[in-house]
Amino acid sequence: MSIRDEIKKRRTFAIISHPDAGKTTITEQLLYFGGEIREAGTVKGKKTGNFAKSDWMDIEKQRGISVTSSVMQFDYAGKRVNILDTPGHEDFSEDTYRTLMAVDAAVMVVDSAKGIEAQTKKLFEVVKHRGIPVFTFMNKLDRDGREPLDLLEELEEVLGIASYPMNWPIGMGKAFEGLYDLYNERLELYKGNERFAKIEDGDTLFANNPFYEQTKEDIELLTEAGNEFSEEAILAGELTPVFFGSALTNFGVQTFLDTFLKFAPEPHGHKTVDGDEIDPLNKDFSGFVFKIQANMDPRHRDRIAFVRIVSGEFERGMSVNLTRTGKGAKLSNVTQFMAESRENVENAVAGDIIGVYDTGTYQVGDTLTVGKNKFEFEPLPTFTPELFMKVSAKNVMKQKSFHKGIEQLVQEGAIQLYTNYQTGEYMLGAVGQLQFEVFKHRMENEYNAEVVMTPMGKKTVRWIQPEDLDERMSSSRNILAKDRFDQPVFLFENDFALRWFADKYPDVTLEEKM
């Protein structure tokens, strides 16, 4: 098969949702259909046969939340599917937003009893900004939920996206009978031995069933007043196809997967800082690092840089240019993933996600290219932290482990590090409290370095240019610090302290982000 055909087989997407909407469950069901797991909840290593959950980090297993982005790959129906599972917890939005830069489509999982929730709305805004297609799965029909028409209306009113139902529920909760599949023109049955039935048999199958009568009325209303199906609008991110089902009971999931793969886009191009778009079919390899993850295998204390291949083909052992440094690097030890399981990879093409073993060479946002044409992809989103903690090693004899742990976890982008200009103290910045808890847990469990963390509360952060720096600017209302790139930054007590500083030093430009 030609490289062009291989690229056209790729379907790379992320699953987004509010916590507890069923994202992990539907991910596992998709892996089940891809032959990667024997049953939902257990992920099978391709070679070892060992079981592992898609949530691989200890704290994820303990707390039932996703705090890192997993990458999973499988073949299904002639397609190579790359799923990027994303953190659902709001404190990890920064990692999630970067992950959404590496996909061509998004699957939005919604709890049919709760509708659009806060985190779903936030993540949808990022997807909408990128203009990529969104496919919606209304989950948990095995439980009582809101009226389907209300859910569609909420998509349009809250998210501002038109919707088209691909199927429609017949009852829900204990009265759930199945789905009226509008796209495939059939009935999908929840009970009994037969999975599908013809639509014309519906009146016989559901004779005197008020829920089936309601379904027919809803569909008639949608036919007259609903949106028209348009593949063009779907690919433009203007229309979301809506699928109903139950991930927990694995009902409607395979129908969703089959239909999703018909309409999900092939790998798309990616823009450079100069505004050019790199075509996936360009023969020269290029890619960008969207995530760095330390200790995916605690036995080896390794670190992986996740790279989205934008164009061309990766071949093991190839040399690439690292645009940020202008230096070359050899990609010899490269893997692909199935949650905890990983395999060395010889070849991969545009649309694939590869993991490059990293000894400190790479940073999040790095561009990799080959050939004479050196360029840089547009930067990944960054977020200014609001919460701060002082951090130090509990045991002075563990300083080496402490510094190694901080260096690696900061390079992941999971937390931000600042150093007090006057005292040299380390300060951590985060978007949310949970990031601190995960940092502490990982320092103790992965680096054997207990830490002392002292809350500093909320701060307003502003960067200044190095040439404007004067240490006399530091006062009781601010802290002068350096970020991890040695750029000067002020941590202000509050907005009043920020305004006071701006009035006192009108010639100093304060930047919200560097």
From Swiss-Prot:
Signal peptide: none annotated. The gene is prfC. PANTHER family: PEPTIDE CHAIN RELEASE FACTOR RF3 (PTHR43556:SF2). It comes from the Bacteria. It comes from Streptococcus thermophilus (strain ATCC BAA-250 / LMG 18311). Increases the formation of ribosomal termination complexes and stimulates activities of RF-1 and RF-2. It binds guanine nucleotides and has strong preference for UGA stop codons. It may interact directly with the ribosome. The stimulation of RF-1 and RF-2 is significantly reduced by GTP and GDP, but not by GMP. One of its GO terms (biological process) is regulation of translational termination. GO terms for cellular component: cytosol. This is Peptide chain release factor 3. Gene3D superfamilies: P-loop containing nucleotide triphosphate hydrolases, Peptide chain release factor 3, domain III, Translation factors. Residues 8-268 form the tr-type G domain. Keywords: Cytoplasm, GTP-binding, Nucleotide-binding, Protein biosynthesis. Belongs to the TRAFAC class translation factor GTPase superfamily. Classic translation factor GTPase family. PrfC subfamily. GTP binds at residues 17-24, 85-89, 139-142. The lineage of its organism: Bacteria, Bacillati, Bacillota, Bacilli, Lactobacillales. It is found in: Cytoplasm. HAMAP family: Rel_fac_3. InterPro entries: EF-G-like_DII, EFG_III/V, G_TR_CS, P-loop_NTPase, PrfC, RF3_C, RF3_dom_3_sf, RF3_GTP-bd. One of its GO terms (molecular function) is translation release factor activity, codon specific.
